Amino acid sequence: MAHIIEITDFSAPELDIYARLTENQLVNRADPENALFVAESPLVIGRALDAGCTPVSFLMERKHIEGKGAEVLARCPADIPVYAADLPVLTQLTGFHLTRGMLCAMRRPRLPSVAEVCANARRIAVLENIMNPTNIGAIFRSAAALNVDAVLLTAAGSDPLYRRAARVSMGNVFLVPWTYLPEGESWPDLLHDLGFRTVALALREDSLALNDPRLLAEPKLAMVLGTEGDGLASSTIAACDYTVKIPMSHGVDSLNVAAASAVAFYQLALLNG
């Protein structure tokens, strides 16, 4: 049985990880061996455990200890701290109503190299400076559903392990392999060295159609999506082998990046991956 610790005061220091440390502070770039993230809801926590993430502690509504949290707790060491409180205490925690009554602090896993993530991959997504955790989560959910083998991110973008990103992804940030691209070098060249051809999603008049036979014939394809608002950098588009855009109607000029990713993944990965 887990080690249950009753919490009656929102100011209790045991709640600092969950209530007072920012997600950037939890990342702890100065001491990556002790970096943490917080997963929320039994579904997301369960998928993190499936991926081998190590739990540090739990915070949960007391009634869930023997309820919907019991199965998750049964998978964890018997001495793991489980901070339990009644709902009036926990509702002081911003966004607690979205957690399904359960939070878990976990060790951040070691990220693999780009070569490791891309080994045996045929269709990958590259996310350049995408800042919104909701978009990151939605893209990962689409990637898992639509046959994308891996996701690569630039370091300036949002963290897939942020609570909102993991929640929106339905835990699929723990299913789809991912890592960050190295800073200070040309990642299109790196992907070319790994055998990938790159396709930029961008609003250019000379863009190809998504079902262009040249794209469908590529054995290894990296689909490159850009930041909200501005899209991909001009230098990135120039470095890619192809540029495509999604046909629009009714005068609409573009889709949200998460919606655009789903359309591209469906055409280029699920149907032709």
Give the role of each language-model region.
Residues 1-71, 157-158:
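Boundary-proximal intrinsically disordered activation/regulatory segments immediately upstream
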Residues 5, 109-206:
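RNA substrate-binding interface of SAM-dependent RNA methyltransferases
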Residues 49, 76, 192:
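Anion (oxyanion) recognition and catalysis
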Residues 67-79, 236:
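Short, aromatic/basic amphipathic alpha-helical patches
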Residues 75-95, 179:
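A glycine-rich helix N-cap at a beta->alpha junction
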Residues 102-104, 142-146, 157-173, 234-273:
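Structured adenosyl-cofactor binding patch, chiefly the S-adenosyl-L-methionine
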Residues 199-252:
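Active-site/ligand-binding-proximal alpha/beta "capping" segment
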